[in-house]
Curated annotation (Swiss-Prot):
Protein's recorded name: Nephrocystin-3
GO BP annotation list: cilium assembly; convergent extension; convergent extension involved in gastrulation; determination of left/right symmetry; kidney development; negative regulation of canonical Wnt signaling pathway; regulation of Wnt signaling pathway, planar cell polarity pathway; Wnt signaling pathway
Gene Ontology CC, one term: ciliary inversin compartment
Observed phenotype of the null mutant: Bilateral morpholino knockdown of the protein in the embryo causes gross body edema that is typical of a renal excretory defect.
UniProt-listed Pfam families: NPHP3, NPHP3_hel, NPHP3_N, TPR_12, TPR_7, TPR_NPHP3
Subcellular location: Cell projection, Cilium
Feature: compositional bias, Polar residues: 1278-1288
TPR repeat positions: 443-476, 916-949, 958-991, 1000-1033, 1066-1099, 1108-1141, 1150-1183, 1192-1225, 1234-1267
Organism of this sequence: Xenopus laevis
Function field: Required for normal ciliary development and function. Inhibits disheveled-1-induced canonical Wnt-signaling activity and may also play a role in the control of non-canonical Wnt signaling that regulates planar cell polarity. Probably acts as a molecular switch between different Wnt signaling pathways. Required for proper convergent extension cell movements.
Length: 1300
């Protein structure tokens, strides 16, 4: 027996089985054993029954034994599993602790590494900044050293030139002393070598320049010195230094002629050089029907015809009731007009007599005139009309009378046909005799300019700006400025640009233009490159167009045709290289003048080349306003224009008032003098404007009132505002005053101005009477001017005054007027009228308005983009696309899509030809963007269209082949390019002949291609062939500016010489003869040269040297026409005059001797040629000294003549002497030495000395190989034996001669 505690093991749990669900498990501690008494008492349930058995008492516990055992086992299992889990968790805890410690250690290591890397990064960044600072310092030092070296080089070159010039002077003096019989010790006879001067001169051949190689040229160093060290005929690089069809013209003659023609063109009357065809129409009441039909039906046709050629067409007329009014305005209009038309019946009304007298009888410039004479049955002409017709037609043959009797419609058509012919022939210069003239004209335009894209209007604008700037006759106090400018030209190089500064209106433009005139007059060999910058944001202030124009101006003095990159950034890179190249070859000074350079956007950025030292013979002059001059330029030498002093103010006032027959009182003069003493009132523009205003008011008798108002104006802008108010007061009605405001506002908000015909459309209700009267007043008061047919403000102060007076509404009013201009040009586009005006104005206005979607739509007009691109406005076109937010690929894609859409509607040859042009333009545009792979597709499509729509052998197919080959060449696909170039060459030769400029262009392209493939010999041969073609054609690419405009006005030039006989008129006739001669128009040239000769003989006498000039040119013309007998007679006559009139060493005498000698040789009169060749040697020895290369050249030519006469013994010493001169002066490895060696080899070969001949020929070939290997693409010409002065032996060794 035992107690209940014996049933419970230590630590076991006894569950409460009695209960009501709220019991808890109890753990009975077994360490404390319960007392027996307590245990016994716990089982008592009342009175104890004695005698009860133990079994009966414990039977209840035994019933749960099995359950107990099961629970015990489960518990044991549970306990063991939990113990295992606890043990496992403990192990995991230990493991996690270890992992945690490891990760913490790694984290600490990473943090240390990060800190180390961070410190290294900071150290590297610091090192980077230090390296950049060192690099910047090094670059600065390098540029400084480079500039110093260039200055040193240029200085030394100048010193060498001075020494060589002094040497030549001493040699010439020595020759004169020896000629006088004075014995002088000749250092050249000494055995000492101390006197030898070895000089190396580059070849005188015209190099072939490519834009891509510009930056890789070596330093000009000795080239500058040596190019100018020898001044002989073959070393004198003329602007037209050529052989060929006009090689016989005295080089001085055509140099002077061309220079004079190109310089005098801008100084003609405005109607001769304007790009506006202005017709002044007069009519009577009887012919009103014809006038109305003509204006309605035919005036628009003439307008479209002129627009196609880039001209404005304006038909100006006054109503009949106004004929007796506004005589000054009508007279001004007649003077401006390029043609006058008179509709008349049988009588001349009195109201038209003044106009007819002004237009027909005072037509000093012999401008075209048309008279439509309506004849009616039974009515005879009045005496006044008969007198007009007889006087005018007898005086000058420029008036055409169109007689008509019958239907007014037929009469109007008849007049239209005559007027169209006059405009085309006399004003536009279009030949209409050939039915295919239009196509040929377009072709010839392309021939003239090649791949160079330029805008004729940009050049026209500069010519007019120069002409207008030089119109003033006031040069008060300019002489001191002229002297300073002359000192700049004469100062030793190198020197920085000269800065001309002054306040607004101080006369900077006038000073520069007047000085340019003086330089052109007194220094014809000086090349003047000028640019007058207009108002800010105009085309003339666009930096890319300025640099491009100056680059093209430099290129025009080279025979080579280089493809000029359209990338604006490359202009800046290539311009200094072109400047340096030309400075080496040009014999005179090169002066670059940029007026108002501070108006250029970001002028310091785009004119960086001004900072670098300039070549020796280059001078740069720029003008700026004092307030806006960049700080970096203020260190340059500065010529500041001082304000006018009292004396100058008084002289200017008297000059202006005297010219207008206005007399001021002494009191009025004193008031003006006292007023014009402040800084803002004593400048030239202010004084000029105030006197103009007083003279203008003098006609109304309100001088005193206007003077009082002027005295209240303290600056030029306020004075211009007074001008505006004064003109507005004379307008008779409020409507006309509103027209004035609108016109000035339109001009103010436009890009480059507005034309009169555009104003007539922009201002409904505006009449020619009102418009011309208003413009006359504003032009007289120096507020408006004409530029390229557009009305612009003469000065920035006038623009400011208009803005202050009429544009007070700010941006709103500006936008309002711009929208009207946009609407006008948009309407033109909707009618398929795309002109240079709509392309320029619309795109710029959209840009200024910020209307990107409209700008994008405008750019997607294929003809607008084509117009901009083909006129060379590539930079603007690119900037517009950038504003729209399109990159190059997007541009290409959108143009492709637009072209495909346009192609769907193309039918007919004309449309397909236009489509081909668009595809070609797109291909060239993409090529200029650098998208060569994308450019191939449109060029191929252009080629396909032209081959299909026209003919596989059409010249335009050659154009497509040429452009496509250019892309392949840039892509280095030389095989494809060569094949296409050869196809283009074949087509061009078949279409134009072998001596056309198109052929020369293909030869040039092939030469560049061979050069890139290192095929220098083939490239050189093609260059020579191309050069001869270009020399024969005489329409050099570089003359595109002068000659392109000059050819259009040649007839007006001719008319200027119809007056009385003068030496100036005779000179002009000679120059016109040279001009036509240069164009191979020999018949016309002969006429002018004969007229020049006859006039000179009458005015100057038959033995005057000027007569010899005309005779010499006539002889050259007959020589070209192969009329050798006439040429020989004239050459002999010219030689006789020049021998008697000129010094023995005069260049003109030398030229005549040369040409006559060549003619004698050509005719086989070798005995007559010998003394002339000997005389040529003698002249050159006297002119240049016995050791000059020119003397060697003359000796070679004389030796060749002796060989031709089989006098080898006489030729041998001449060859040896020539070779000695060449070796001493040019170096033993110079090409001239090699050519002389070849000639000596021929001579030895003919004498039978084959061993010596082989030795000489081997040495000549070594020189040739050395020359090719060293110079590569610039290998000088070997001077082949072809040409006028050539003798060749028909054997293995050709004899070569050198041009004289």
């Amino acid at each position: 027996m035992g107690t209940a505690s014996s049933l419970v093991n230590a630590g076991e749990v006894i569950e409460d089985t009695y209960g009501g669900g709220g019991g808890e498990d109890c753990v009975i501690p077994v360490e404390v054993k319960p007392k027996a008494r307590l245990l016994r008492s716990s089982f008592r349930r009342g009175p104890r029954v004695i005698g009860a058995s133990f079994k009966s008492t414990a039977s209840v516990d035994l019933e749960y034994a099995a359950e107990y055992e099961r629970l015990k086992k489960e518990y044991e299992i549970f306990r063991v599993s939990k113990n295992n889990e606890v043990a496992s968790m403990q192990k995991k805890e230990i493991k996690l602790d270890e992992e945690n410690k490891r990760l913490r250690a790694e984290l600490q290591a990473l943090q240390k590494t990060y800190q180390k890397i961070l410190r290294e990064k900071e150290s590297a960044v610091e090192a980077k900044y230090q390296a950049m600072e060192r690099a910047a310092t090094f670059e600065h030092d390098r540029d400084k050293v480079k500039r110093q070296f260039k200055i040193f080089r240029e200085t030394k070159e100048k010193e060498i030139q001075d020494l060589l010039r002094a040497k030549r002077d001493l040699e010439a003096k020595l020759q004169r002393l020896q000629a006088q019989g004075i014995q002088v010790f000749d250092p050249g006879e000494s055995d000492s070598d101390d006197n030898g001067t070895e000089v190396t001169v580059p070849s005188t051949q015209c190099e072939y320049w490519t834009s891509g190689a510009l930056g890789s040229d070596p330093s000009m160093g000795s080239m500058m010195q040596l190019q100018q060290s020898f001044r002989g005929p073959e070393f004198a690089h003329s602007s037209i230094d050529v052989e060929g069809p006009f090689a016989n013209v005295n080089r001085d003659d055509w140099d002077a002629a061309v220079a004079s023609l190109l310089q005098v063109t801008p100084l003609f009357s405005q109607s001769l050089w304007s790009n506006t065809v202005r017709c002044y129409l007069m009519s009577t009441a009887e012919t009103q029907a014809e006038v109305e039909i003509f204006l309605r039906d035919y005036s628009p046709k003439l307008q479209r015809m002129c627009e196609t050629s880039g001209y404005f067409f304006q038909m100006v007329f006054f109503p009949e009731e106004c004929e007796s009014q506004h005589f000054a305005v009508r007279k001004w209009e007649i003077e401006k007009s390029s043609i006058v038309i008179l509709f008349i019946c049988s009588s001349l009304p009195s109201c038209l007599q003044e106009d007819c007298e002004e237009a027909f009888l005072k037509n000093n410039e012999a401008k075209p005139r048309l008279i439509y004479h309506s004849i009616e049955d039974g009515r005879s002409d009045s005496d006044g009309l008969k007198q007009l017709l007889e006087q005018d037609t007898n005086k000058a043959n420029k008036t055409k009378v169109v007689d008509h009797c019958g239907d007014p419609v037929e009469g109007a058509y008849k007049l239209y046909c005559h007027l169209e012919q006059v405009i085309k022939q006399d004003l536009l210069g279009i030949e209409i005799s050939d039915p295919d003239a239009k196509d040929e004209s377009a072709t010839m335009e392309d021939d003239d300019y090649g791949d160079v894209l330029w805008d004729v209007h940009d050049e026209q604008e500069q010519m007019e700006a120069y002409q207008q700037a030089s119109q003033s006759i006031c040069e008060l106090g300019f002489q001191k400025y002229y002297d300073r400018l002359n000192d700049l030209v004469a100062a030793p190089a190198p020197i920085p640009p000269l800065l001309i500064s002054g306040g607004p209106g101080s006369g900077k433009s006038l000073l520069l233009s007047k000085w340019i005139q003086l330089q052109q007059k007194h220094s014809p060999n000086t090349l003047m490159l000028y640019h007058f910058v207009g108002r800010p944001l105009s085309s003339s202030s666009e930096p890319s167009l300025i640099i491009k124009r100056l680059t093209l101006k430099l290129m025009q003095h080279s025979w080579s045709v280089s493809s000029l990159s359209m990338d604006p950034g490359k202009f800046l890179e290539e311009f200094p290289h072109w400047l340096e190249k030309l400075s080496i070859r040009y014999q005179g000074n090169i002066i670059i003048i940029i007026d108002s350079i501070d108006h250029i956007q970001q002028s310091e950025k785009h004119m960086k080349w001004l900072i670098d030292p300039l070549p020796v013979n280059v001078r740069v002059i720029v003008s700026v306003n004092v307030e806006t001059c960049p700080q970096a330029w203020r260190l340059w030498p500065t010529l500041h224009l001082d304000p006018l002093n009292s004396k100058d103010v008084k002289a200017l006032i008297n000059m202006e008032c005297g010219g207008a027959n206005i007399l001021l009182t002494k009191e009025q003069e004193r008031k003006l003098e006292r007023h014009c003493r402040s800084a803002t009132t004593c400048n030239a523009l202010y004084v000029t404007l105030i006197t103009k205003l007083l003279t203008w008011a003098g006609s109304t008798g309100k001088i005193e009132d206007v003077l009082q108002q002027c005295l209240q104006c303290q600056d030029t802008v306020s004075l211009y505002r007074l001008v505006l108010r004064s003109v507005q007061e004379v307008m008779p009605s409020a409507k006309e005053k509103e027209f004035m405001r609108e016109i000035l506002c339109f001009i103010s908000v436009s890009h480059n101005g507005v034309s009169e015909c555009e104003l007539m459309e922009l201002c409904p209700g505006l009449t020619w009477e009102v418009l011309t009267s208003l413009i006359y007043h504003l032009y007289t008061l120096v507020l408006l001017k004409y530029t390229c047919g557009l009305l612009q403000f003469q000065h920035l102060q006038a623009w400011d005054a208009v803005n202050l007076e009429y544009m007070q509404g700010g941006q709103n009013i500006i936008s309002e007027y711009r929208e009207k201009i946009i609407k006008h040009f948009t309407t033109q586009l909707s009618h398929d009228r795309v002109t240079w005006r709509s392309a320029d104005e619309l795109t710029w206005l959209f840009q200024q308005q910020g209307e990107k979607q409209k700008l994008h739509k405008c750019l997607m007009n294929l003809f607008v983009s084509q117009n901009l691109y083909k006129r060379g406005h590539f930079a603007e076109l690119l900037s517009y696309w950038q504003l729209v937010g399109k990159d190059k690929i997007s541009m290409a894609s959108e143009y492709f899509d637009a072209l495909k859409q346009y192609e769907k509607n193309c039918e007919g040859e004309e449309k397909m030809t236009s489509l081909a042009d668009l595809y070609e333009t797109l291909g060239r545009f993409l090529k200029d963007l650098g998208l060569l792979s994308q450019a191939v597709t449109p060029l191929q499509r252009s080629l396909e269209i032209r081959e299909t729509a026209l003919d596989p052998d059409h010249p335009s197919v050659a154009q497509s082949l040429h452009q496509l080959a250019g892309v392949y060449m840039q892509s280095k696909k030389f095989g494809n390019a060569e094949q296409l170039y050869k196809q283009a060459l074949e087509i061009s030769e078949n279409a134009y002949g072998s001596e056309h400029l198109r052929v020369a262009r293909e030869l040039d392209a092939l030469a560049v291609l061979y050069q890139k493939q290192n095929k220098f010999e083939q490239a050189e041969q093609l260059r020579k062939k191309s050069l001869k073609i270009r020399q024969k054609s005489a329409r050099r690419k570089g003359s595109m500016y002068g000659f392109a405009l000059l050819r259009r006005r040649a007839l007006q030039l001719e008319e200027l010489t119809l007056g009385k006989d003068t030496s100036d008129n005779a000179r002009t006739l000679n120059e016109l003869g040279v001009l036509y001669y240069l164009q191979n128009n020999l018949e016309t040239a002969e006429t002018f040269l004969k007229r020049s000769l006859e006039m000179r003989e009458r005015v100057l006498g038959a033995d005057h040297p000027d007569c010899a000039q005309s005779i010499n040119n006539l002889a050259a013309l007959y020589n070209e026409k192969k009329q050798y007998d006439k040429a020989e007679e004239l050459y002999e006559r010219a030689l006789d005059i020049r021998r008697r009139a000129l010094s023995p060493d005069h260049p003109s005498l030398a030229y005549t001797v040369k040409h006559l000698a060549v003619l004698y040789k050509r005719k086989g009169k070798l005995d007559k040629a010998v003394p002339l060749y000997e005389l040529a040697v003698d002249i050159r020895q006297k002119s240049f000294g016995p050791k000059h290369p020119s003397v060697a050249t003359a000796l070679v030519n004389l030796a060749v003549l002796y060989c031709q006469m089989k006098k080898q013994d006489d030729a041998l010493p001449l060859y040896e002497r020539a070779m000695k001169i060449y070796e001493d002066s040019l170096g033993r490895m110079h090409p001239r030495v090699g050519e002389t060696l070849k000639n000596l080899a021929v001579l030895r070969y003919e004498e039978g000395d084959y061993e010596k001949a082989a030795e000489l020929y081997k040495r000549a070939m070594e020189i040739k190989e050395t020359e090719t290997s060293v110079l590569g693409a610039k290998a000088p010409s070997g001077h082949s034996s072809s040409g006028g002065d050539t003798y060749s032996v028909q054997n293995t060794l050709p004899v070569s001669v050198f041009p004289e």
